[in-house]
Amino acid sequence: MMLKMGAMFVLLLLFILPSSQQEGDVQARKTHLKSGFYGTLAMSTRGCSGTCRRHRDGKCRGTCECSGYSYCRCGDAHHFYRGCTCTC
């Protein structure tokens, strides 16, 4: 009798653990997508132009102008593109 109850308990655990792990994976995926979206949103280059470039000291400098945005800066580009860019 105790052996049957022990076997039932093990089977129950085998079904519960994978389903809870899948729920955690879904939540992690949602968080990753949300952070990627806001990172791209903050790095808008629409309407930006200027003379932003990397100097010999490795820092990005130059003038930037953005149409429709109150703040514009020259800085390192997104990690997909190595270089400098104007961002609003």
Curated annotation (Swiss-Prot):
Question: What's the record's remark on domains?
Answer: The cysteine framework is VIII (C-C-C-C-C-C-C-C-C-C).
Residues spanning the signal sequence: 1-21
Name listed for the protein in its UniProt record: Conotoxin Ca8.3
The keyword Protease is annotated on this UniProt entry: no
Its Gene Ontology cellular component terms are: extracellular region
Give the GO molecular function terms: toxin activity
Q: Point out the propeptide residues.
A: 22-46
Species name: Conus caracteristicus (Characteristic cone)
Where found, per UniProt? Secreted
- Top-rank lineage group of the source organism: Eukaryota
Q: Which UniProt keywords apply?
A: Disulfide bond, Neurotoxin, Secreted, Signal, Toxin
Family classification: Belongs to the conotoxin S superfamily.
Query: In what way is this protein post-translationally modified?
Result: Contains 5 disulfide bonds.
Q: Look up keyword Repressor and say if it applies.
A: no
Recite the lineage of the species.
Eukaryota, Metazoa, Spiralia, Lophotrochozoa, Mollusca
Please give the tissue specificity annotation from the record for this chain: Expressed by the venom duct.
